[in-house]
């Protein structure tokens, strides 16, 4: 009922909620615009979602002629799952021109993950006839590499190269279930955006999941995990690799040993030698041929270089003869790539290379990346990339405490979080009696639930803050002595009179007993 719905939505919008109206009208016209604002209600919705099959040029013209903002108020809907990779979905019909791919309205991508993720099962069934009624393939670990490629194909174009977007009819990737495509790639009409600014930045390339956890290159937890709070800033472009002889290098995320299968469910080998992470669950891996230097642009940035600024790259190579360089593009010379040597390669563990940037004081870094050169099959893993002005190391976390600890290892801890402007995240670890580090969690916040700390006896609980340049604070520490805790908590039970249900042994009473810790009987 318009008489009730419009004033209701007008009220929600006026209170600061961003709202959007959708109906099956595939045009932006008077009927659609009536859901944006009118004389009686004022602003009703913040924007409208125009149904699929729309025409960006006509919508832009009508909006401008009638006083509407074609970018703030008009979103052209693109139904991703309906056409999949087969067509452009009509997004190119809304380009400014054949040469200028700037959309004439905003774009609303509807359920893209349905087709690059959920659509994998449809493609496997279509190609092989295989299904899995117990658990979809898209949820099984051995198929995740396919979903990662399909996601990059959706956003970066069929060739997973942001410099080669656009309709690629006939371009196929049969290994991941894509037989042909007309999809243009989001990068064809949306330039990279970035939150990287100021004078400090860091990333460990964490995708927020892992087959295991690593601390300074060593495995610190053998459990598979997923935690978006631990995700680092990922590359702005996936991928942008160039060389004089063409692109011969490839890029991926290296999780260490991981299972992979093909569309038939048969095991396939990784295309690189798995290394794993320096910190977190994965590193960036560059592999392939690089007889001619290959430059990979990774991050769009707006970083100010100061007199004491340095860049840090933690990396390793498969071959000692491989050369790696930091590759920078400055805002005042966007057509020039400045390369700075990272020194000799390390083939035995990770190398921490520091690069002095003081010669570039006063300039702004617009792009950060790497350049790789070497003979034969080259592989370089990168575990950290950072820029620092030496001002971002945070203080020791304050107020660290254990709020709850159970005998089976569950734990709730809390602390006083610092402002996000100065602290990127917090690392929670346990250090056992032998000095081994056991990674528990990493995220920004002021509390954490740990499902199980699988350690016996005494151990040290350690909390460290990570700064905006990746520097790490001194730890806040708590000693946990498991032997000082009560154990074997039980309560007296009995069957009811019919022998069917277990209940308290004495009606109206709960009788508890436990094994006292070695240090004595609890006093409260």
Where are these regions (language model features)?
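Chitinase-like catalytic core of GlcNAc-active glycosidases
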Residues: 1-61
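Substrate-binding cleft of secreted/luminal carbohydrate-active enzymes
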Residues: 74-260
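Short carbohydrate-recognition loop motifs
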Residues: 259-295
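Extracellular beta-strand ligand-recognition surfaces/modules
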Residues: 313, 352-385
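Solvent-exposed loop/turn segments flanking beta-strands in beta-repeat/beta-sandwich domains
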Residues: 321-323, 416-436, 515-524
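Extracellular carbohydrate recognition and processing domains
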Residues: 333-364
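Pro/Thr/Ser/Gly-rich low-complexity, intrinsically disordered linker/stalk tracts
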Residues: 389-421, 470-522
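Beta-strand-rich modules
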Residues: 449-475, 524
